[in-house]
């Protein structure tokens, strides 16, 4: 696949890194020569210095042959115009635009971004995607990772198995016997930084992060089996009042009437601005790394501290300070995968990685076949995938035990007409079923083959 990416910042670089690693033909455009130099030095991509919405610059990037244009600069208007140019002058099949300003995304104005008005096929808002991930973590405090598929009917959750975890050293087949009525399936394990698909003979070890698939209404019960029955937070401190912090605070005010929210923002003008946009939250002007500010926010009595500034180090350190001062749980926004790798070891209860979240959103549209959802694990080592089974799919009409699935794949659930089914060897997938599965990176091409439209269909 030929892909042109406009914007070589954190988001654009992350997308380019992932797509290039999968042997796609990637060109990346940015006005900064330094960013292009970094991208071409570190990645197998073609770099072009220039304005991402200029036709001549896009032409130099090879837009005429592109299958997809991904515009993720920091400027919404540049992204919009780039998509318009890609459509009108170069007939690019798929256009993806990053939109940051919330006014464009309001329901009354969003139709402007539809194909009928502005030729944007996919709108991504990393700030909203990250904000929603934070909100999901708050609703499931026992999980270190979570995503929902099947129109919200299915949840995938990662859970840390500590020394007190009741199911450590128990074979997965025995778990099924112990809890026969629990419709949850463990599909993957992260062990010492390496992710693997599970088999029935596997045992969970202390320190593992187990990923399970369960109906949304059974996630709490499943977490309790792993020894996690934490109560969702009510007293919440948010460090950082940027777009993500403001979105999380606003949504908490709407969704959680019992929540008591404090927002700490270091910029005085920004603090005043977000205070005007919030109704029940208390906004404090100050540094979230300052002990006196955290004390003023009531950190000793808080349930959760969330650090959402643009600086990974500030987020990690402010969370650790908050925990030392009495916060029950801490959640940090971490952009650099290197920091994310040791976050749990430092005592960070959970973290969100904006780059990984955005890449997952883009991959949903890069993957071939009827792929409805993608959630990347461990910086691309594996993926949770939701796909629609077609009449011509090799999965349809045969018991799962007769399907030649690779060792790096594991089916976690089948959704039929809104009903979530736990898969067994006797399960027969039907056309239009939604299948939720895990696949290692090397086996994703096989997943695409299973869910692609066969030429025989036509």
From Swiss-Prot:
Residues 144-228, 372-453 form the RCK C-terminal domain. One of its GO terms (cellular component) is plasma membrane. Keywords: Cell inner membrane, Cell membrane, Ion transport, Membrane, NAD, Potassium, Potassium transport, Repeat, Transport. It is found in: Cell inner membrane. This is Trk system potassium uptake protein TrkA. The lineage of its organism: Bacteria, Pseudomonadati, Pseudomonadota, Alphaproteobacteria, Hyphomicrobiales. It holds the Pfam family TrkA_N. The keyword Signal does not apply. One of its GO terms (molecular function) is potassium ion transmembrane transporter activity. The RCK N-terminal domain binds NAD and possibly other effectors. This is expected to cause a conformation change that regulates potassium transport. SUPFAM superfamilies: NAD(P)-binding Rossmann-fold domains (SSF51735), TrkA C-terminal domain-like (SSF116726). InterPro entries: K_uptake_TrkA, NAD(P)-bd_dom_sf, RCK_C, RCK_C_sf, RCK_N, Trk_Ktr_HKT_K-transport. Part of a potassium transport system. The gene is trkA. Residues 1-124, 233-352 form the RCK N-terminal domain.
